[in-house]
From Swiss-Prot:
InterPro entries: ClpP (IPR001907), ClpP/crotonase-like_dom_sf (IPR029045), ClpP/TepA (IPR023562), ClpP_His_AS (IPR033135). Keywords: Cytoplasm, Hydrolase, Protease, Serine protease. Cleaves peptides in various proteins in a process that requires ATP hydrolysis. Has a chymotrypsin-like activity. Plays a major role in the degradation of misfolded proteins. It comes from Bacillus cereus (strain ZK / E33L). Signal peptide: none annotated. The gene is clpP1. The keyword Protease applies. This is ATP-dependent Clp protease proteolytic subunit 1.
Length: 193
């Protein structure tokens, strides 16, 4: 069952019913609670652009509980976060892995957070290839470039040497919230709003 909860709010004109995500959007909160695919990316990008149009000065809050997903979909979100004027605060609630972790560490500096029992995981991009040898070679080169670019981004955002990042992302590298803070992925571990 995938029922979306509704909340009822009292207004001057009576009661108003919202699905919970629309109500959170009123408070400038966007939630990524699934694998990152094109549909999720389109929804998050639309919400980011809408909130910027509503008020370009107020921060936006991106709550992340995601195993990652498509790099192209993830970059659509990340590039939009960088494009818009408002700062995007990020918060890991549960799990931020792969591109979920990249979105987490791409929040505004000083505004990247994790809840105490969160887990963060970074690794190299995954991919596969089939076809003729030339096609496989093209795909391999693309994945290696993507790996380098992602490692460079992690190093820049965390302050870690690229050599350490390259070593750590050779495999799934899991961190607790406190370890992610020490690594530079988040700025603080929060227990209260």
């Amino acid at each position: 069952m995938n029922a979306i909860p509704y909340v009822v709010e009292q207004t001057k004109l009576g009661e108003r019913s919202y699905d919970i995500y629309s109500r959170l959007l009123k408070d400038r909160i966007i939630i990524i609670g699934s694998e990152i695919n094109d549909q999720v990316a389109s929804s998050v990008v639309a919400q980011l652009l809408f909130l910027e149009a509503e008020d370009a000065e107020k921060d936006i809050f991106l709550y992340i509980n995601s195993p990652g997903g498509s790099t192209t979909a993830g970059f659509a979100i990340l590039d939009t976060m960088n494009l818009i004027k408002p700062d995007v605060q990020t918060l890991c609630m549960g799990f931020a892995a792969s591109f979920g972790a990249l979105l987490l560490l791409s929040g505004a500096k000083g505004k990247r957070f994790a809840l105490p029992n969160s887990e963060i995981m970074i690794h190299q991009p995954l991919g596969g290839a089939k076809g003729q040898a030339t096609e496989i070679e093209i795909t391999a080169k693309r994945i290696l470039k993507l790996k380098h670019d992602i490692n460079k981004m992690i190093a820049e955002k965390t302050g870690q040497p690229i050599e350490r990042v390259a070593h750590d992302t050779e495999r799934d590298y899991f961190m607790t919230a406190e370890e992610a803070k020490a690594y530079g992925i988040v700025d603080d571990v929060v227990t209260k709003k």
